[in-house]
């Protein structure tokens, strides 16, 4: 033992304690199992079951016994070091394992168990604590302290393994059991790895049998006659239970996993498959080298690789042909396609994996050991191909068809990603906007109330171009919006008496005034500075900057103004008792209530209704009270 140094204690068992050590020569980490009882001869040591079994077992999924040392009547086993056991791996897990990782773990356990059974031993104490791991990628069977040779003669002791993983024949105190008890324990461990909880957590042996009955249902006498003999021998009365569906108890297990579980958890040990038979179940036939690292990552990567490698006729996308560089829409299609083709992780189980494999028969022929796996999924695939083709036939991509596997028409434009505005097809609305802009430029400037409400794309405030903005594109000209806004506008008066209009003119009008484009009125300006800016704008319309259309570029309708401060609150005013004498002469010029009040010059443009003249300012003031007197 002077060739090893001990670092710390890893665990303490019934027959010995385990220490973490290091080899002084190589620096390799090792596990030292120190037996609690003393051994006074080598013959006594060599008769130990653990030594007998481990001397004969050399397998990748069986923990390796490096050396046996007897020193001062103490016996030490030197094992290879493993980071953790399966119980610790399950306990530290905060989310469920992917099925590919579970399949890999169970495959390694059954491989090691088949090797042990083949060499004439059965373990008798399989539980998560006795399965040593280096993460989920590598699992090895350890602790052969209770191992027995299969050819050894009964009776055996009735206490074997931890109660939760004990087979029903052992719970009923049978003394004639064999390797099927290990298969039962593997079934219990498999369910626990899926759910992260024990399947039969009984508080006692009888309670464990009750737990088994609640899951599997009460066995019939014809199904397991030996079980009824054992129960009558110990005066045990079977509870009457209805079997539960394992799929409902383990919802994240596939149908192949449930099939394997159901067979390993048979009441009758003769009906359970052997470990080598379990390895041939469809659950392990997944078309890749078994025992490799997690299948889930391969499943999620295969669709991407297939899309990048595949080059076919026009319905498929080629990865940037060198001779003819594609236009921008096509480059966007390819980039979006790779994103959409990634299946979600929680849906990658058999269906997604099979879809990706059916797309690429070359991969299937290379990797798959068996010719046909999951036949029902193959039958579904052509239908999904047809629907994908029809989906893109009309040049439309609906947002619900997010997952595609490479079938996209060349002429379509991918607009699935609504977060990217460059992908939106603005062509119909832009052509309509350009026609209207030409019509407006050919005619004189058109100023009517509908144009204010029709929030068509126009130039933003302070800029000279007419590129449509996102806000203006999304607000469409609908009759309900127009009528609702008109009622909102006509219902509220902005006239506040007692305020000097002349003093309300801004000292720096350059910030408020905009280049004289009569259609910039539909764009929203910056934050209003209260009622004074509104009145000053109206004053400037009436006095200084009245254009040929009677509307300046900086006019902002009141229904678009943000109500800020106490001066911008909606105020209903009483009639003014003593209006100015000059106001009475303007009552005849008051516009019709149903018509907008802006002044436009008469023109012969078809489809436009001539408007009555707007009220002219008197002494620099607009008669707002006379305008809205009838509306009060």
Curated annotation (Swiss-Prot):
The modification Phosphothreonine is found at residue 157. Residues 4-284 form the Protein kinase domain. Residues 312-328 have a biased composition (Pro residues). ATP binds at residues 10-18, 33. Residues 299-308 have a biased composition (Basic and acidic residues). It is found in: Nucleus; Cytoplasm, Cytosol; Cell projection, Cilium; Cytoplasm, Cytoskeleton, Cilium basal body. It comes from the Eukaryota. Expressed in heart, brain, placenta, pancreas, thymus, prostate, testis, ovary, small intestine and colon, with highest levels in placenta and testis. Not detected in spleen. Also expressed in many cancer cell lines. Keywords: ATP-binding, Cell projection, Cilium biogenesis/degradation, Cytoplasm, Cytoskeleton, Developmental protein, Disease variant, Epilepsy, Kinase, Magnesium, Metal-binding, Nucleotide-binding, Nucleus, Phosphoprotein, Serine/threonine-protein kinase, Transferase. Residues 290-344, 457-481, 582-632 are annotated as: Disordered. One of its GO terms (biological process) is intraciliary transport. Its EC number is 2.7.11.1. The active site is at residue 125. SMART domains: S_TKc. The modification Phosphoserine is found at residue 161. Its main location: nucleus. Its cofactor is Mg(2+). Residues 463-473 have a biased composition (Polar residues). CDD domains: STKc_MAK_like. It catalyses: L-seryl-[protein] + ATP = O-phospho-L-seryl-[protein] + ADP + H(+); L-threonyl-[protein] + ATP = O-phospho-L-threonyl-[protein] + ADP + H(+). Required for ciliogenesis. Phosphorylates KIF3A. Involved in the control of ciliary length. Regulates the ciliary localization of SHH pathway components as well as the localization of IFT components at ciliary tips. May play a key role in the development of multiple organ systems and particularly in cardiac development. Regulates intraflagellar transport (IFT) speed and negatively regulates cilium length in a cAMP and mTORC1 signaling-dependent manner and this regulation requires its kinase activity. PANTHER family: MITOGEN-ACTIVATED PROTEIN KINASE. Belongs to the protein kinase superfamily. CMGC Ser/Thr protein kinase family. CDC2/CDKX subfamily. It is linked to Endocrine-cerebroosteodysplasia: Previously unidentified neonatal lethal recessive disorder with multiple anomalies involving the endocrine, cerebral, and skeletal systems. Juvenile myoclonic epilepsy 10: A form of juvenile myoclonic epilepsy, a subtype of idiopathic generalized epilepsy generally characterized by afebrile seizures with onset in adolescence (rather than in childhood) and myoclonic jerks, which usually occur after awakening and are triggered by sleep deprivation and fatigue. EJM10 is an autosomal dominant seizure disorder with variable manifestations, even within families. Affected individuals have febrile, myoclonic, tonic-clonic, or absence seizures, although several seizure types can occur in the same individual. This is Serine/threonine-protein kinase ICK. The gene is CILK1.
